[in-house]
Amino acid sequence: MIDRRFAAWCCMVLAGTSAGAAESWTQFRGPTGDGRTQARLPLEWSESRNVRWKTPLPGKAWASPVEADGRIWLANATEDGRRLSLVCVAAATGRVDRDITLFEPATPAFCYPYNSYASPTPVVVGGRVFVHFGSAGTACVSAESGAILWSRQDLPCNHHRGPGSSPIPFEDLLIVNFDGFDVQYVVALDQATGRTVWKTDRSIDYGTADGDLKKAYCTPVVFEHAGRRQLVSPAAVGTVAYDPRTGRELWKVHHGGYNTAARPLYAHGLVVINMEGGDRLLAVRPDGEGDVTKTHVAWKYGKATPTRPSQAIVGDQLYMVNDKGVFTCLDVATGRARWQERREGRHSAALLEARGRLYVCDEDGTTLVVAANPERFELLAENRLEAGCMASPAVVGDDLVIRTKTHLYRIGGPATP
């Protein structure tokens, strides 16, 4: 029997799915976590066209924007990691309303220059903003007053190259992956108090003592399949599914690889998972128990798969771009490639899909708008901004919100069909 909390959570997700342009973008990849929206986004823009406002963002942070109730929230950090903060920008004007210092580490852990000290994306739910900086700290802030409601700095992890996994909400919990050089676990915190509700260590045989090969930067996903709700949480070497209420392990699959960052997707009764190395990309039937490596893998695909950019599923197709700019369309059911197209540019941002159009931001300032066309690669527009994107785009109304390495933009124009 579905409990009331889960029923309420399902209603929230369904409301976000059907709300169209009015939906709030409350977590990494939006309210449903898959980078899809019914908003009528602009097709073309530049520094001098269709930019409603442009706000400078000092510091170095790759966290994606989130939005609720007319406020855009961004995790931020100084380049040296000595100040970790939460920035609030008015969605209507681009004005910075708050810049809240959350943590000031005296001796920040090492962060690889390609990463940042503020790469995990915040979550907004129930009038609270949850901000996560890996082991440097996790905090809850009142969206209305900006007051810090609680904070934690006692969740250990040597990220070795900086944090990357974003927190996700589930009912009254906040769930976070910690897959580090030294320890690997998943933890659920009470949203109201920050206390630990459950913590489950990874049960993966990594086959090595090298902590660098145990790292992962993935954001998990929660869904219900055949009446069973599950938290699918990729790690290095394997992916584990847990009961999101208790942390009990349900199933796991060994696929090799490490440094996974792209968020998994659930569609057509399959979970699509990818990682760097190993099997690279695979689809798993999520109805098993225990080790399902030999029994529940539907297909594998290993050519030009991404490490960082999360994919999008539109209809029966999976669309993706890899880190080096190779676009691919696969059939979700079979894993068969329908087409592949090589373009220029390096990519970290997740794909955003709106009404059959894929918005693909690269690290040099170009955003390609590509049709979700299963028959061929179809470029609809190519748009340039002054600086590139490590963060993934967000949606406010029928506008795009893009965080580049230097600025935050709200991009809008005539509604597209």
Annotate each language-model stretch with its function.
Residues A7-A8, K215:
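Mature extracytoplasmic/luminal segments of secretory-pathway proteins
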Residues G20-P417:
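Noncatalytic, solvent-exposed loop/strand surfaces
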